[in-house]
Each structure stands twice: as C-alpha cells, then as structure tokens.
Amino acid sequence: MMSELRDQMIERHIRAGYIKSDSMAEAIRLIPREEFMHSIYVDHAYVDQPFPLPGDGKQTISAPYMYPIFYEPLTLVEGNRVLEVGAGSGYGAAIARELVGSSGLVVSIEINQTTFDFARENLGRTGYDDVVLVHGDGSLGYPAEALYDAICITAACPAIPLPLIEQLNAPGKIMAPVGGPHSVSG
C-alpha cells in the first residue's frame, strides 16, 4: 500500500517537474518516507504538505516535493561530500546518502535535541546509520568533515553564514531559502 502511494507520488513529482533525474526518482523510491514521520501522521506520508515532528512543534518534515527542489540543483553524484543544515526527521539526509552512495559522505546538523534524537532513531532504524548526525548550530557548519561538495540549508536564513561558505569545496554548490520563508536561492 505505502509503496504504491510512494510510486504515485514520484510519478506526480516527475510530471510536475520537481523530479528531473532518474537518480532522484530511484533515491526517493528506495526510502520509506513513512518511517521518518511522527506516528500520528504516518498515513499521510505521501501527501504533498509538511507535517510536525515530535518536540516543540516548530520543526517539520518538509512536503515531499521540497526534497527534489533542494537536492536536484546540487547534482549530487557518487562520492560527493554533503552537509545538510537542519536534519529534521532525517529523511533529507537519507535521500542525500542514496545520491552520493557508500563512497560519499553525508553530514547532517540539527540544533533541536528532540528532533536530533528523532532523526538519529529514524536513520538507524532504516539503515542510514552511516550518516554523520551532529547536534549543534548548523550556521557554524561542521569543520571536522569539511570540505563539502554541496551544502543544503533546509531552514530560511537572512544570508548564507560565512562558516558554511568557508567549508564549501571549490567548485561547490549551496542551496538555501535565503531572504524569507518563501524564498529559495541556489
């Protein structure tokens, strides 16, 4: 049942132009989004809207179409090193991990302790325990694993923090919603 809903969502996102690459379609096909949802929302895992995560109610799992919007422009390939700022449920990190493969690296930072614990549990349970999950301030990046080929900031920010720019490989790409809650810059 859920795999059918996942396939329908993928086809919907291909038709809408959100999913552009076969690698993105395959990554999303392999990851059971329902495993990254708060238990009371599992039945809605493939509905195109965000849902609250456990905790203070401020963190959400983004609407499913947002992941290809953020990750497709980064053109992640096998072996890339990726920093995700805002781990949320861990779903985005799992997608990035599928895209960069076992020779790549995904580091995901989460500032909220409850959300961090939820992401760690989800990633471990679904076999993505090789994602480096860090509890801390994402605006500082994670210098211990820098340089990164790509950085994805999942929360709105007034500007891209300088420490993240300094941790970006050259050439590299940053994707971030800069300027306000409805802005996206790449």
Regions found by a protein language model. Name each.
Residues 75-186:
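Conserved nucleotide-cofactor-binding alpha/beta core module
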